Amino acid sequence: RPKRGDIVVFRYPKNETIHYVKRAVATAGDLVAIKDKHLLLHPKEGNEFVKANYPKENIVEVGDKLWVVNPYSKEHPGIHNDENVVDNGLNPSELFNMSPIVVPEDETFMMGDNRDHSNDSRFWGTVNYKYIVGTPWFIYFSWDDNKEIRWDRVLKSVETLEKTVDFEKLKKIEHQEGIY
């Protein structure tokens, strides 16, 4: 079973002949939400687990729960949002905000690292473990939205695709009071 943060190959629940590769951002029993394009996670282990395992600057308190904001961004700097994708009514609202949900038993919540250009659990729900195929070793083939081959990604390991981000910018994310 995938752990939080793992990159996973799975069969698309709406069409089992299609394979997807996404990051498991929440597992059974976790609470997950999106606020202003930021992933929020309240692990099933609870508040003490959050305090013991995540940096204080990434934790916000809402009611009686501690939430981790963008829990994988520092460890996996390839996770990013596109600053050109804005909430102007033309883009899907799920990119920007999603009310908290509990991930059901035997399921996981998947998100692509290219957050604003990913067809993932925000749009079609959690993925049952029966659809999990495994972990990717390398990129066999890759193309963009225009069906152009991305030669710079072909035959690269998943780890080599991680790119550097400005960690100071991540620290400056303003946390608003409350999730919804």
Predicted regions and their residues:
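Soluble "head" domains of membrane/secretory-pathway proteins
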Residues: 1-180
